[in-house]
A protein has these predicted regions:
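Short, solvent-exposed turn/loop segments enriched in Gly/Ser/Thr/Pro and often Arg
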Residues: 56-69, 120-128, 206-209, 285-286
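A short, structured beta-strand-centered segment in the mid-to-C-terminal lobe
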Residues: 88-97, 151-154, 312-318, 326
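Short, glycine/charged-enriched secondary-structure capping and boundary segments
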Residues: 67-70, 132-135, 295-297, 492-493
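Signature of Gram-negative outer-membrane beta-barrel scaffolds
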Residues: 1-110, 298-301
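Surface-exposed extracellular loop regions of Gram-negative outer-membrane beta-barrel proteins
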Residues: 62, 114-151, 211-217, 345-357
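Short, solvent-exposed micro-motifs at the edges of structured domains
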Residues: 32, 49, 61-63, 157, ...
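Surface-exposed patches in mature extracellular/periplasmic domains of secreted proteins
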Residues: 53, 114-118, 337
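Acidic/polar loop-and-plug regions of large Gram-negative outer-membrane beta-barrel proteins
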Residues: 10, 14, 18-20, 142-176, ...
Length: 530
């Protein structure tokens, strides 16, 4: 199986293909990965008002293996494809240094049981999932993705992998032989005080730092040389490569452990235990999360694989402010009376919007040199960002159009000769000589620089319990989700194109219809307990 490509619609209708792409070979695998964990933990009463907790965990996270050694890795230092157990073993080195200490304490400074100071620190190692290495099983000689011109010699399918096909190329997919296990350092400090019986307030700080996080790069990302000809750093595998020597190279998908992240948060909570029919729990969090990539997929997500720091920005899930309060109230009447057994509860959530990254759509062909090629295809991904134009202003009350909600202006500039470039354009396609940059360059917009709509939701329920006889109860529940039917918008369209009717426009809600927080929904329930 595979896919044909056509030069244009007319060629498609006539059935005149100009190329064929397919994966040849057996890509089924039998991957196994072992792990062993040991830990010890204990707590010590240092003083009557001071408890110390200590722990240590050690993980032996073995490198994945394939039953028949059907792994081939790309080795950057030699520009070669090397088979496991034939010049490379294992697929990446097992990390024996996964020592993960834990330390924490709880202290009652006034010895009255009303104040508690707690702090803790821990290191937590991550076991890589096996899809880190599944791409290694799709490399030659076990399987290969080939892009073939339509005019090639005829050959038997059984000989398709080894035959020299004019124009055939290889796109290796490999994990880094020097891959390191990711780990997270986590620490926190909390102060809790009982204000009065049943009511306590806690203030705290929480932080974490991720190291050796997984990133995927294209090691063979195209650049334009002095003659504006698209050029790759590695045009072909080394002539001394043990596998496919001298075969032309396309993109090299390389999974490595060079990412990191950070999270910092201040939070305050108030908790009231049930008394006199009332209980509630309220919390507010002020936080910021930063990383290079919030996804765990194998695909390349960096705009520029040679500039990892260019993708450092807010995490996809970052929400600067979040407030949640939940409560329950029982009417103060005897449960066996007509007004007794009534209970009301609610959950209210208020949250800042999540960030979104703008993309450059229709970046267009590279006009200099040959062959001409689309900028997105040259980098091996479709996450090129535009250049910064006029400042983006988000109105407190977004404008509603026939296409949806206009979250920010959708004016886009194409600076090429003959292109449209309206005044006030917020995004500029990175396709021409702009501000000293080459005709082909990476956009100056940062990752996750636009904040999307906030989230507000209130759920409410009414419960009536009626006692029947000595030990039977009929319970009626009326639950209302999104009580006020508040519209929680999704993210705005992020692909910048000249004349686009969707760029900057919100066309959907945050959650699909039927999910909590999408629209008002009610449900009734009747329960008989005996």
């Amino acid at each position: 199986t595979g896919s044909f490509t056509f030069a244009n619609t007319a060629a498609f209708l006539a059935g005149n293909a100009n190329g064929f792409t397919s994966t040849l070979g057996d890509v089924s695998t039998a991957i196994a990965q072992g792990a062993l964990g040991l830990f010890v933990q204990d707590n010590f009463k240092v003083r009557p008002n001071l408890t110390l907790e200590l722990g240590l965990r050690w993980d032996w996270l073995m490198s994945p293996t394939e039953r028949y050694d059907r792994f081939a890795a790309y080795v950057l230092e030699t520009n070669s494809l090397v088979r496991v157990n034939n010049g490379l073993a294992p697929i990446y080195q097992t990390n024996w240094k996964n020592f993960q200490p834990r330390v924490g304490f709880a202290w009652d400074p006034f010895k009255d049981g009303k104040t508690s100071i707690r702090a803790a620190y821990a290191i937590l190692a991550d076991q890589p999932v096996t899809n880190l290495v599944t791409g290694n099983a799709t490399n030659p000689p076990f399987a290969t993705s080939v892009a073939l011109p339509i005019t090639i010699p005829t050959t038997k399918l059984s000989n398709a992998i080894t035959v020299a096909v004019p124009g055939a190329t290889v796109s290796p997919s490999s994990s880094d032989p020097g891959f390191e296990n990711a780990y997270v350092q986590s620490w926190n400090l909390n102060i809790e005080r009982e204000i009065k019986s049943g009511l306590a307030i806690t203030a705290g700080y929480f932080a974490s730092k991720g190291t050796h996080l997984r990133l995927t790069r294209n090691l063979n990302q195209t650049f334009l040389n002095a003659a504006l000809v698209p050029t790759r750093p590695f045009p072909a595998l080394s002539p001394t490569s043990p596998i496919a020597p001298g075969v032309p190279l396309q993109n090299i998908t390389f999974r490595e452990s060079t990412g990191n992240s950070s999270y910092n948060a201040l939070w305050v909570t108030a908790n009231k235990r049930l008394s006199r029919g009332l209980q509630f729990n309220a919390s507010y969090t002020f936080s910021k999360s930063i990383d290079y990539n919030s996804q765990s997929s194998q695909g390349v997500t960096l705009q520029d694989s040679n500039n990892i720091k260019g993708d450092r920005g807010l995490s996809d899930f970052d929400a600067r402010h979040r407030f949640v309060i939940s409560g329950l109230y029982e009417l103060p009447f005897k449960k066996d009376s007509a007004l007794g057994g009534w209970q009301f509860s609610a959950i209210v959530q208020l949250q800042s919007g999540n960030p979104v990254t703008l993309l450059a759509g229709n970046a267009g062909a590279i006009t200099g040199g040959a062959p001409a090629a689309n900028a997105n295809s040259l980098t091996g991904l479709a996450t090129l960002r535009p250049d910064v134009g006029a400042p983006i202003t988000i109105s407190p009350v977004a404008a509603t159009t026939g296409n949806g909600v206009q979250w920010f202006p959708n004016l886009v500039c194409d600076p090429r000769p003959g292109g449209s470039c309206p005044a006030g354009a917020v995004a500029i396609l990175p396709v021409a000589f702009v501000s000293g940059k080459s005709i082909y360059h990476f956009g100056s917009f940062g990752r996750n620089t636009i904040i999307g709509p906030s989230f507000t939701n209130t759920d409410f329920s009414i419960i009536k319990r009626t006692k029947v006889g000595e030990n039977k109860i009929i319970e009626f529940r009326w639950e209302i989700f999104d009580l006020f039917n508040h519209a929680n918008f999704g993210q705005p369209g992020r692909t910048a194109q000249v004349g686009s009717t969707t760029f900057g426009v919100i066309t959907n809600t945050r959650f699909a219809t039927g999910d909590s927080g999408s629209s008002r929904q009610m449900q009734f329930a009747l329960k008989f307990k005996f």
